[in-house]
Amino acid sequence: MIELKGKQVVVRDRELKRREEANRSYLLKLDSEHLLFNYKLEAGRFSGRDIPEGAHGGWETPVCQLRGHFLGHWLSAAAIHYGETGDSELKVKAEAIINELAECQKDNGGQWIGPIPEKYLHWIANGKEIWAPQYNLHKILMGLVDSYRYIGNKKALTVADQFADWFLEWSGQFTREKFDDILDVETGGMLEVWADLLEMTGKDKYKTLLERYYRSRLFQPLLEGKDPLTNMHANTTIPEVLGCARAYEVTGEARWLDIVHAYWNCAVTERGCLVTGGQTAGEVWMPKMKMKSRLGDKNQEHCTVYNMIRLAEFLFRQTGDPAYAQYTEYNLYNGIMAQAYYREYSLTGNKHNHPSDGLLTYFLPMKAGLRKEWSSETDSFFCCHGTMVQANAAWNRGLYYKDDDAIYVCQYFDSELTVQV
């Protein structure tokens, strides 16, 4: 089964169009120099003495160890939006950013393109505590890969391919046990991007990287029917299993698909979910069928919602089971739509003392009496800020699917499909 998307699916739903346009406007509003600041700083291409006025705050400040992560999300979102609409303004902005990233890579010696120093990776290898450098670096790889996939920018692919050489050399110096220790520090979607690059380039080095990034300490217990997930940081594991899904699509090896099914069984089928579809508290998986005690102000992290929707859509394409489409529907309405680009619609016209709009809420509080906390446009940039711009980049995804016998309508939003049957 394949997903029907791109220009053949046109969204007519007014609310979805509002969200998509708000997302586009936000992507264009963010200054390219501020988006690039940490990359230029790392490459020695910033010559100022002070942090520029208007520089991004929150997780993008130059003292944050995850600085620079958002640009990868930005590139991915801009590329996805271009793939849906052919938006030339976003394309021009994205390509200018990619050109500057290529210059940063040259000044870094021809491989490194990260917004953080190489030593962060050496530190985690030595056991020094550092905040998820591979999670961070995956984001720019993802953005470059999506820029090639949706925009066709060959320079983006070249930059990503050369950056991969750094990881090939670095990861090759460790024993299996030592690298498993390194993989215990959140890696984001590195496995997925290696599968993407294997498909795009056909180079054997990506087969090597897929094997090195195989996280047996998570995957083996899942395959044995155990529960390694309860109280584990959820969004560490979901991107890793999305990597297995992508590896299966690219290689056709059943072992990858077995992991995906085992993960879904442990994470969803046996665990259950909140009425909204969410399953986390404080960023970790809640115990199976025992979620009441964990209700509070930090339920349903937006990143987990976005990534689990991606996993559900993969499984729907593989199986055609409507349960996966139902899971997606719960999380679209009660997660993606509930947690970003909020606008109040007053039925009475009465004034209220709560915000009439909001950009993004990291969590969805599920305990009675609590309220959402909305982020800033330029002073937050936590992880969910990135998945927000990706989730709202193109609302024509996940609506229609097709196999040899039928077309499947999976979400009942006002939309138009053009397809040859």
Question: Residue locations for each model-derived region?
Answer:
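Glycan-recognition and catalytic cores of secretory/periplasmic carbohydrate-active enzymes
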Residues: 1-421
